[in-house]
Amino acid sequence: LMDFERDEGKILACCATAQSDIVIEADIEEDPDAQYLPLDDFQGVVERVAALTPTIRGIWLRPDKPMRFQAGQYVLVQVPGVTGPRAFSIASAPGDALIELHVRKVEGGQATSWLHEKLKVRDRQDFRGPFARFFVRKSANRKALFIAGGSGLSSPQSMLLDLLAEGADYPIVLFHGARNRAELYHAELFLELTDRHPNFTYVPVLSGGDDPDWIGATGHVHEQLKSYGEGDFRGSKAYLCGPPPMIESCIATLMQGRLFERDIHTERFFTAADAGTPARRSPLFKTI
């Protein structure tokens, strides 16, 4: 801080320690769709595990008590022998008996390696939640675009399952990007949903172009996004979940298609490789 800022009573809240009881006032933007649910500690019994892809494992936990969460939120999982919890988005819909998690194995990652190699059915797993403000703005009642990369599918899956279960009748589109067909998962689930819900469209996209039997979309997700609706995204709400490079490319495409910050909601997936890069808003967004 500069001396004049100290004289004005300003502090750096990120490194200040309260010495007594205090009252904090803050300007917080209220969202009519936000549910302020209490955090709680849970212990779940592992009901099922499955290799969704060669690098992504599905884990289904039965919590020891009902868990309330908004579709799109995540939990913190405490892994034995690993310092600090790890965050995993919930893939199941609110109200489901089981909590579904998608865990991508990170090279050299102690936590994800343990969850892939050691965790087994009937084990007990501690977790805490729910966290995050990544949720569907249902009050908007307009076209929803879900854009996911890899295991970033978890939050969008929960969100669209929730919307369809509630009878949303506006267009809902899911773009899911994967490197190859082996890394694409839950395709059968989404194809079944397209049969049951005429307003739902599923667009799987493979970035690897070496599969001669693949007749679906290829390239990067943002490239396929450009061709959707002739590149005009006005009147939509977009929800993006995945690695930061994919998020930034898709934000640029959406904004070029006249969809702006207030209608674009993101959740970035970081790994140990991203540790040196602080989490931040998209440089394309003006609001701090």
Name what the model sees in each region.
Residues 1-22, 171-288:
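Reductase modules of NAD(P)H-dependent flavoproteins
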Residues 155-165:
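Histidine-anchored nucleotide/phosphate-binding helix
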